[in-house]
Regions:
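Flavin-dependent oxidoreductases
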Residues: 72-149
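Flavin-binding catalytic cores
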Residues: 124-126, 162-197
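C-terminal catalytic lobe of FAD-dependent flavoproteins
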Residues: 186-242
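General small-molecule cofactor/ligand-binding pocket signal
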Residues: 15-21, 63-65, 191-195
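Short glycine-/acidic-enriched loop or helix-start segments at secondary-structure transitions
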Residues: 105-107, 160-161, 230
Length: 242
């Protein structure tokens, strides 16, 4: 539940009611009659977002090296020597933005949190439009055109999901399918087309870590599962710090 102070702060920011009680018109199964509606939550096409980011990087003569794993780095006076699985190079400044992969760099202030996901094949006459959260936010689903993207379930196995492995597990994937059948699409047939996972960066605090770690090394990590929403802001703060 939100405290009265939190609700007041949100109202002060948006100058209108952020949450309202709405009747469930989607015919979800096994839930309360009403949903909590937030008109300010939106969808983003992350594919288009990354295309725009790559285009902006190219326009600013920024070189992107793919499939490179940083194995070590060493500060050398005014430079930083970076060693990857493929090459070694020097740079004036090193900025870490690897989020869930930054545990060692931040003395375990950031822990990896795997997020498992699935997406259905196209569903004829799909009526569900929007973004949705359930079970304290541990599950999230949205439509992508006429498909349902559904992810979450980390609370079923916190220890097992504290990993940088990109595997999926039967425990969580089976639960996602079960909720699809019983809650989200109780009256429709569907098929799963893809399953995958990603890595978030979480910690004991929600506030991101934007810090100078040494003379020439900086980090912007611990997005707390909100990387898409706040990543660009954290990037700007990190750039300003340098």
């Amino acid at each position: 539940m939100f405290s009265a102070n939190t609700i007041h702060s949100v109202f002060s920011l948006f100058k209108t009611d952020v949450f309202s009680k709405e009747v469930d018109r989607f015919n979800f199964g096994g839930i309360f009659e009403h949903l909590i509606f937030n008109p300010f939550e939106a969808q983003i096409d992350t594919g288009n977002m990354m295309q725009a980011l790559l285009k902006k990087a190219h326009q600013n003569d920024i070189l992107i090296l793919n499939s490179q794993t940083v194995t070590s780095f060493q500060e050398l006076n005014n430079d930083v020597e970076v060693v990857t699985n493929g090459i070694t190079f020097k740079t004036n400044k090193l900025l870490y933005t690897t989020n869930g992969f930054a545990s060692q760099l931040t003395n375990n202030q950031v822990k990896p949190a795997r997020a498992q996901v699935l997406i259905t094949k196209p569903i004829p006459n799909l009526d569900i439009k929007g973004t949705f959260h359930l079970d304290k936010g541990y599950f999230y689903f949205r439509n992508i055109n006429d498909r349902i993207l559904f992810g979450g379930g980390r609370n079923l196995d916190f220890e097992g999901e504290t990993t940088t492995s990109h595997d999926t597990t039967e425990l969580i994937q089976n639960r996602l399918e079960e909720l699809l059948k019983t809650v989200i699409l109780p009256h429709q047939e569907f098929e799963i087309e893809h399953r995958w996972s990603g890595t978030m960066g979480v910690g004991t605090h929600k506030k991101p870590i934007v810090e100078q770690l040494s003379n020439n090394v900086y980090c912007g990590v611990r997005m707390g599962g909100m990387g898409v929403a706040i990543g660009s802001l954290v990037g700007q703060e990190l750039a300003d710090l340098v």
